[in-house]
Regions:
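Acidic, proline/glycine-rich intrinsically disordered inter-domain spacer in sigma factors
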Residues: 91-119
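Short amphipathic alpha helix immediately N-terminal
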Residues: 120-140, 144
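Hydrophobic positions on the alpha-helical face of helix-turn-helix-like DNA-binding modules
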Residues: 52, 76, 128-129, 141-142, ...
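Sigma70-family region 2
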Residues: 14, 40, 51-68, 87-88
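Structural recognition of an alpha-helix C-terminal capping motif at a helix-to-coil junction
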Residues: 33, 47-54, 67-79
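DNA-recognition helix of helix-turn-helix
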Residues: 145-168
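Arg/Lys-rich amphipathic alpha helix in sigma70-family domain 2
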Residues: 64, 75-96, 107
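A short, charge-rich alpha-helical start-of-domain segment used by transcription regulators
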Residues: 11-33, 37, 46
Length: 168
């Protein structure tokens, strides 16, 4: 028990591991939000989260403070989830019985419906919506996904129209 407390508090980590641990602590909520948007259930979101963390660790040595940390984390998370989503589409999808939101309140039903509609978007559009829901500016979204702020604005208008057309 004591050993796990020492490890959890970073006593046996080298400087890179401590720095990476701090990065994960600062951005774990954001990373998990991205994973949830691409997952069919919480177990899948946790698996995606692990994959994102592995990719962040592999790229951490080359990143380490060079550029915008938040943008880098977003890009790695988005790219990982989009790649995994594309791989998943090669397999037959089994209907999901476990829902991310299990409460039956009206708000949770609306949230579930919104999540389902967003989940039906193409991965790139889903990424744009997720970033927009996180209150990032069009400029920040554009930098992360690699398009202009004007293009972000146009795409969001089209995405909102598409979401309205989806049947619940």
């Amino acid at each position: 028990h004591c050993l796990s407390v020492f490890i959890a508090n970073g006593f046996f980590m080298n400087a890179d591991e401590q720095e990476f641990s701090g990065l994960v602590k600062r951005h774990k909520g954001t990373i998990y939000s991205v994973c949830l948007m691409f997952a069919d259930n919480q177990d899948e979101a946790n698996d995606l989260m692990q994959e994102v963390l592995v990719r962040l660790w592999k790229g951490f040595g080359t990143f380490q403070g060079k550029g915008d940390e938040k943008g880098w984390v977003w890009r790695v998370a988005m790219n990982t989830c989009i790649t995994q989503d594309a791989k998943k589409k090669h397999f037959t999808k089994v209907p999901v019985e476990e829902n991310l939101l299990t409460s039956d309140t009206e708000d949770s039903k609306q949230m579930r419906m919104l999540h389902d509609r967003i989940h039906r978007l193409e991965p790139f559009d889903r990424a744009i919506v997720l970033l927009w829901l996180e209150d990032l500016s069009y400029e920040e979204i554009g930098q992360i996904v690699g398009i202009s702020a004007k293009n972000v604005s146009v795409r969001l208008v089209r995405i909102k129209e598409q979401l309205k057309k989806f049947n619940g």
